[in-house]
Structure formats: C-alpha cells, structure tokens
Amino acid sequence: METNSEGSGGGGRWRFALLALVLIPFLPEIAIWLVSFGAQLGGCEPSANAPCHLGPLAASALIRGALRAGSMVAIGFSFGLSAVWLALCYLAIVRGWRRRWSRILLALATSLPLAVLPYFGPMLSISPLVNAECHPNEGGIPPWCRIYGGDVGDPAHEAVRIGWNVFIGAPVALVAFLVFVVALLVAGRRTSPQQGERVSG
C-alpha cells in the first residue's frame, strides 16, 4: 500500500542531509567558481601576466588546489566511492520521504549528476578561464597553463584526462540505482500483504 503523506519531523533533517551529500562532491568546482568571481571583482583577468591575489593567497594557487581535489573526487568515485556515496544518499531519501515513487524519482535525480558530473566538473569549472596561455588538453602540451598570472598546468591537464573515468564510474552509479529500485519494490511488495492482513484482522 502506498503511503500518501511525506515524512515530517526528522524527515527535514534527512532532506538537508541529502542536499549536503549531493553538494559535497562538487565543492572543488564551487570553490573555483567563487575564486574566479572574487578575482574578477578585484579587476583581475584570467589571461593576466601579473599574479592575482585574494587576500594573502594567489588565485592561481587556490584554483590549482581545487582542481587537484576535484580530480581526487573523480578518481575515488570511479573506483567505488560513488556506490558508497549513493548508498548514503538513498538512506537519506528513504528516511526523508515516504512515497515510493518520490523515493525512486529522487534517487534518479541524485544518481544522474553523481554518475557524470564528478568526472567533467573540473574541466567545466575552468573552461571559462581558458586563454591564450592556458589550453588544457589530454596530452599536456604545452605543460604550462597560466590562469590569473600563475601556472596551474598539471592539474588543468589532468582535469581533461579524468573525464575518461566516466566510463568506469557511470556504470557503478547505474547499478547502484537499479539495486536501490529493486530493493525498494521488493520491500514494498512484502509490506503490502502484511498491511492487508492487519486490516482484515
């Protein structure tokens, strides 16, 4: 039997947990966008030769660190972390929502971005910053990539190469979603007869 009301009370905490779980893997990309926004507010251009600083820190150093973090997330997700992460998301969905189809649709909406974006997020985050001195590519040629007056070469080129990991990570996420849906439907079928027996009794 389908429940008509969504979770309340503690459900709000689980919904917030789901939002956090979806956003956390993309913190490196969010950081790059924020650094770029701050740099441009300060009058800096991505193609500038002079170093651009946000307070005591160079914008290029912040971007380089965020790119490395994004690549680490992508590597982790492509080798099984995505399944663990999605399991946590599914737990939050089950605890935060009661309707079966709400759970399935939310699981799909969560699984799709986590199946693809971790591998392309680093590359997409620096694509607006590409300039005459920075052309990220798989071959890493030329080895340098200057953004806001600093070299982010190796991490920028790795951001392009890491996209291939989607062919490992995406199937893992798809299998995790299918397992969740099957488990949800099986659990629903087991619950319905029990509820029917209680009503008739």
Locations of regions flagged by a protein language model:
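Long, glycine/tryptophan/cysteine-rich extracytoplasmic
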Residues: F37-G65, A69, E133-R161
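Membrane-interfacial entry segments at the cytosolic side of transmembrane helices
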Residues: R95-A109
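Short, Lys/Arg-rich, polar N-terminal cytosolic tail immediately upstream
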Residues: M1-G10
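Transmembrane helix-loop junctions in multipass membrane proteins, especially transporters and channels
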Residues: F37-C44, V94-R98, N131-H135, G188-P193
